[in-house]
Swiss-Prot record:
GO terms for biological process: cytoplasmic translational termination. It is found in: Cytoplasm. PANTHER family: MITOCHONDRIAL RIBOSOME RECYCLING FACTOR PSEUDO 1 (PTHR20982:SF3), RIBOSOME RECYCLING FACTOR (PTHR20982). It comes from the Bacteria. GO terms for molecular function: ribosomal large subunit binding. Its main location: cytoplasm. One of its GO terms (cellular component) is cytosol. Responsible for the release of ribosomes from messenger RNA at the termination of protein biosynthesis. May increase the efficiency of translation by recycling ribosomes from one round of translation to another. It holds the Pfam family RRF. This is Ribosome-recycling factor. Keywords: Cytoplasm, Protein biosynthesis.
Length: 186
């Protein structure tokens, strides 16, 4: 592996850390209904943990309601239990044909908790980015040790890796700030 491919690999892996952060953020509840809120919830469907979207259709008729229409009558109670077990603080209402989830406005306390969760997810993404930096630097040092890279090139490559890291850490902070602002907006 040469210096350029190590840098490209590091950038790709850092992009994946940001993408994972965005997925986590999409599951964090804000004041609005969103189908992605229930994406992470798994239903114990015939003994197999299955995403809700694979056993029912999920719709968002308005900004305060999510509707879930199971394709199998046996799935109603399973979906209801899975939603109640999730730590989203949602209360499903089952009328026999459809499961409705009304999204209540967030309390100040719940907003603060969600803000903390957003910061935690952002910190995990930063740790992932820094781990990628460490791996890239180790690979670069191996190249230098094997005389495939000069000391000057090593230093320059490590500076490039650090610039990449700084850019992705800043991106993480930016996304975390935007998500916290979205959570705190009433």
């Amino acid at each position: 592996m040469d210096m350029d491919s190590i840098l490209l690999d590091a950038e790709e892996r850092m992009e994946k850390a940001i993408a994972a952060l965005e997925r986590e953020f999409s599951r964090l509840r804000t004041g609005r209904a969103s189908a992605s809120l229930v994406d992470g919830i798994k239903v114990d469907y015939y003994g197999t943990p299955t995403p809700i979207s694979q056993v029912a259709s999920v719709a968002v008729p308005d900004s305060r309601c999510i509707t879930i229409q199971p394709w199998d009558r046996n799935a109603f109670s399973l979906i209801e239990k899975a939603i109640l077990k999730s730590d989203l603080g949602l209360n499903p209402v089952n009328d026999g044909k459809i499961i409705r989830i009304n999204i209540p406005p967030l309390t100040e306390e719940r907003r603060k908790d969600l803000g903390k969760m957003a910061r935690k997810y952002a910190e995990e993404a930063k740790v992932a980015v820094r781990n990628v930096r460490r791996d890239a630097n180790e690979q670069l040092k191996k190249l230098e040790k094997n005389k495939e890279l000069s000391e000057d090139d090593l230093r320059k490559a490590q500076e490039d890796v650090q610039k990449l890291t700084d850019r992705f850490v800043a991106k993480t902070d930016e996304k975390a700030g935007a998500k916290e602002k979205e959570i705190m907006d009433i």
